[in-house]
Amino acid sequence: MTSHRIRHEKARVDFGRPISFHFDGKSYTGYAGDTLASALLANGVRMLGRSFKYGRPRGIVGAGAEEPNALTQVETGAATIPNLKATQVELYDGLTARRTTGWPALDFDLKSVSGRFSRFMPAGFYYKTFQSRALWPKFEHVIRQAAGYGSAPEEADLDSYDHSHRHAEVVVVGGGPCGLLTALNLGRAGLNVTLLDEQRELGGWLLSSPHAIIDGQPGYDWLKDIIGELRSLPRVQIFTRTSAFALHDLNLIQAVEQLQDHLPLAERSETSPRQRLHRIRASHIVLATGAIERPLVFGNNDLPGILTASALTTYLNRYGVAVGRRVVLQTSNDFAYQGACDLARAGCSVVLADTRTRPNTVWEQRAHAAGVDVRPGYAISGALGSRAVKAAKLVKISADQNSISGDGPTIECDALGSSGGLSP
């Protein structure tokens, strides 16, 4: 088991509150504040699914809404919900979840055999292959099963749901530092402000950045102070666990608030709504939704154990989980350096391949001081492994960064991260 906990006081989980849960029929333990994804990684679970066409192993890539792979079926019977991202499922006692891909089992998916015949299976081949009307019902069942999406509930939903209509002078979407400061300044001016954030606690990227300093204060202290003042302002309303999903004409925003999804089934109230739909008409809207890190492209970059660099840092700093002990990072910018330093200080062996021949000198010196092996002018050409990443093949980049100038070493690793910059 290469994934493991690294307990530190800055983690946003309560290590004094263990939580039992089940995934794919096996029992695991996490902690209050974990997501299903962080708890699975902490228990060494790497492969969470299979790809649609060739049944290639799939693992966790991100740490939030950007996650493309880790779709799960949560709970059973009338309470079941399909296609929830493990990175967005809050862990609670007794949670039951399973993977949605891999048949007959995740460890052995019959679709994996089809990879040997890939040249006979071009994109969209199934549209021209399965044309018999008489046999289509059978083909359809197999194709839908191969797609790997969850199953809709077959029983009536026993939960109740609510909706509300609201008006606000300003709606701020996003509870990171930018959104918090915007809401605070508007609230101080006496405006009617509604602040929406999808996570269980406010803070955004700051929750994964324990070393941040804002206005001369440690980031966590600054966050505590600003949230306290926001909650004291009479015309500011804060909604956490609330996702804004639609923007209509005339500044009408729709958002869904999860009221009980984070509670154990036995603790959910039958007389209270499970979720609430908010329809908010605003005079002005501020989108402070942050940015998503772009991964870099190389061979086999879909293997389990390969994440974005920011996801590796989030699991370490926010959840106290080291995805691997031997980490290789690839970056084209300065953003990955802090994460590399954090991983090295946590006891991981870290190699940082920077595609730039002349990285930022300050960050390079900080990384060396933290014990990071920085390799300027190198890139990853491919990852090695079958069910999980085992090594990374490096190549030398030319001075103009437009071509490969030579071979590089192959470095063994159990986790790999990449950073190609940020997109809003």
Go through each PLM region and give its residues.
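Residues forming the flavin
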Residues: T2-P424
